[in-house]
């Protein structure tokens, strides 16, 4: 490798909040999440959801932020294009009960052409050009 050049890891999967929570809380399926983690990216909206949920269950804020910062360094901001896609998904999927965060995750995956890793079986019923992988 040439010296002085920074090599970037290519992402291969987008994590939904359920995947991050499974890893953080040691839930069923966390082994599959752990294996995919080095190549994962996370929407900032899902990151917000995870931090909020972990703090609500009483975990220490400094520990939560440290763990997430080390485990998931690639948090992708929500841009206008993703927000537009997420809004259309949210409006068209009321019967599935998708949250804004769910739709932001799917929009990021669609934009990047990546599969999404989730624990939510409802996602397999969504009409969106994204491969949905279940970890449990």
Can you annotate each of these PLM segments?
Residues 1-42, 54-66:
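Short, well-structured N-terminal submotif of metal-dependent ribonuclease cores
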Residues 21, 51, 124:
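Nucleotide phosphate-binding site architecture
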Residues 1-12, 106, 110-136:
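Acidic, PIN/NYN-like endoribonuclease modules and their adjacent C-terminal/linker elements
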Residues 72-93:
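Acidic catalytic patch
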Residues 13, 39-41, 71-75, 115:
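Short loop->beta-strand "edge-of-pocket" segments that line small-molecule binding or catalytic clefts
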Residues 15-16, 42-44, 98-100, 120, ...:
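Histidine- and aromatic-rich ligand-binding microenvironments
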Residues 36, 71, 128-129:
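Short, structured coil segments at secondary-structure junctions
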